[in-house]
From Swiss-Prot:
The keyword Cell membrane does not apply. CDD domains: Ribosomal_L18_L5e. InterPro entries: Ribosomal_uL18_bac-type, Ribosomal_uL18_bac/euk. This is Large ribosomal subunit protein uL18. Gene3D superfamilies: 3.30.420.100. GO terms for molecular function: 5S rRNA binding; structural constituent of ribosome. PANTHER family: 39S RIBOSOMAL PROTEIN L18, MITOCHONDRIAL, LARGE RIBOSOMAL SUBUNIT PROTEIN UL18M. The gene is rplR. This is one of the proteins that bind and probably mediate the attachment of the 5S RNA into the large ribosomal subunit, where it forms part of the central protuberance. Belongs to the universal ribosomal protein uL18 family. GO terms for cellular component: cytosolic large ribosomal subunit. SUPFAM superfamilies: Translational machinery components.
């Protein structure tokens, strides 16, 4: 099993648990260059809010899009957008990535901005 397959297996296991609980998810995906976040409804078919370093407003405010500072900016933006839609309680779906570095920075920024998980 390669690295990506193992990560996807971890992600699937966590997502099934969140689906059983019927929780709104804060889903994070990262690449070496960018980081993406989406708040997905409990039914799994509707994206309530999204933010990423690809967006012009966020990428202009930061120097580089692939570091923890960029993840912090995305975490703050996703929290503000989710709260504007009336979502405060979410489950954090790290998509099988380690809770470390950019993933942890995004989570901390989202918590500081008002999301609860």
């Amino acid at each position: 099993m390669d690295k990506k397959a193992a990560r996807l297996r971890r992600a699937t296991r966590a997502r099934k648990k969140m689906q059983e609980l019927g929780a709104t998810r804060l889903v994070v995906h990262r690449t070496p260059r960018h980081i993406y976040a989406q708040v997905i409804a409990a039914n799994g078919s509707e994206v309530l809010a999204s933010a990423s370093t690809v967006e012009k407003a966020i990428s202009e405010a930061i120097k580089y899009t692939g570091n923890a500072d960029a993840a912090t900016a995305v975490g703050k933006a996703i929290a503000e957008r989710a709260i504007a839609k009336g979502v405060q309680n979410v489950s954090f779906d790290r998509s099988g990535f380690k809770y470390h570095g950019r993933i942890a920075a995004l989570a901390a920024a989202a918590r500081d901005a008002g999301l609860q998980f």
